[in-house]
From Swiss-Prot:
Mg(2+) binds at residues 9, 11, 130. This is Histidine biosynthesis bifunctional protein HisB. Its cofactor is Mg(2+); Zn(2+). The gene is hisB. The keyword Glycosyltransferase does not apply.
């Protein structure tokens, strides 16, 4: 999997840029931008690799001798390193604009190695800087740019924007029997819109979203003039696939077993988002239908869902009322799923290194 990178400007972004001569050439001119250290630490924790890229006009010439550049730069690096911030590379263009070099931002010579196929995750990599040239560099690299402003898009806001997850997936499934659109937002809650044509099934799916703490929109057109089999089965397959896609690389997610009593029912669920589909199911019903949903399709729903979601699922309910027994299964699954998809860190919860 390709890597996420942040290409970060120095003067005016990591450290303050002197407004008079725009050169940090003395120790007393060195000042970090507010909140840059906690922001960079948070971004590193979110698996971004850091690259510093800076234009230093005339560096090494009489107008900006190397010996005046080095002390504040080295102190800055010592401070950042001491706080656990590590830059993969420090890329410096020492030329003046009139030199017409190929490495001065917004030109891309300094970052050519990152533009090779498979090196950089271009969707989730950014240039961060305080000047228009930084945004132009981002455009030339084919990635997004963020314009840093101390009183606008500051480091706290940048860190929040780049680390706040919004896991989403869309699945369109069309067969001879059904046409299904599923949108899943694992980090949003409320506002789910569900219409399968089977009213009680809609109510059960809403239990998953409500108790799972996420939003899903499901629109189904199926062959209900025959029965509810294809509608329930294909919805489960599309929903399971959407959840699996939205989980992404699964870093930081938890695994959880949950017990939910409901009136006279006791439902148990254990869920492992393991990459290995399996269902253990135990539930008995007195009647063939609850509302307009076939009770035999409840097991089939969870079997299809666990297959498409690539999870190991144990479900069991006991009680007297069929409505409550069915509802308890969907609720307990939702509550367990809430725990399993919640992001609690950044490590992959597997000794195998893959889920």
């Amino acid at each position: 999997m390709s890597q996420k990178f942040l290409f970060i400007d120095r003067d005016g972004t990591i450290i303050a840029e002197p407004p008079t001569d725009y050169q940090v050439d003395r120790l007393d001119k060195l000042a970090l931008e507010p909140d840059v250290i906690p922001a960079l630490l948070a971004l590193q924790k979110a698996d971004y690799k850091l690259v510093m890229i800076t234009n230093q006009d005339g560096l090494g010439t009489s107008s900006f001798p190397q010996e005046t550049f080095d002390p504040p730069h080295n102190l800055m690096m010592q401070i950042l390193t001491s706080q656990g911030i590590n830059f993969e590379q420090i890329l410096i263009c020492p030329h003046l604009p009139e030199d017409n070099c190929t490495c001065r931002k917004p030109k891309t010579a300094l970052v050519e190695s990152y533009l090779a196929d498979g090196v950089m995750n271009s969707t989730n990599s950014y240039v961060i800087g305080d000047r228009e040239t930084d945004l132009q560099l981002a455009e030339n690299m084919g990635i997004s740019g963020l314009r840093y402003q101390r009183d606008g898009l500051n480091w706290t806001q940048i860190a929040k924007q780049l680390t706040q997850r919004d896991r989403h997936a869309y699945v369109n499934r069309v067969t001879k029997e059904t046409a299904i659109d599923v949108n899943v937002w694992l980090d949003r809650e409320g506002g789910s819109k569900i219409k399968t044509g089977v009213g009680f099934f809609d109510h059960m799916l809403d239990q998953i979203a409500t108790h799972g703490g996420f939003r899903m929109d499901i629109q189904v057109s199926g062959d209900l003039y025959i029965d509810d089999h294809h509608t329930v089965e294909d919805t489960a397959l599309a929903l399971g696939e959407a959840i699996n896609i939205a989980l992404g690389d699964k870093r930081g997610i938890g695994r959880f077993g949950f017990v939910l009593p409901m009136d006279e029912c006791l439902a148990r669920c254990a869920l492992d988002i393991s990459g290995r589909p399996h269902l253990e199911y135990k539930a008995e019903f007195n009647y063939q239908r609850v509302g307009d949903l076939s009770t035999e399709m409840v097991e089939h729903f969870f079997r299809s869902l666990s297959y498409a979601m690539a999870c190991t699922l144990h479900l069991k309910t006991k009680g007297r009322n069929d409505h409550h027994r069915v509802e308890s299964l969907f609720k307990v699954f939702g509550r367990t799923l809430r725990q399993a998809i919640r992001v609690e860190g950044n490590t992959l919860p597997s000794s195998k290194g893959v889920l």
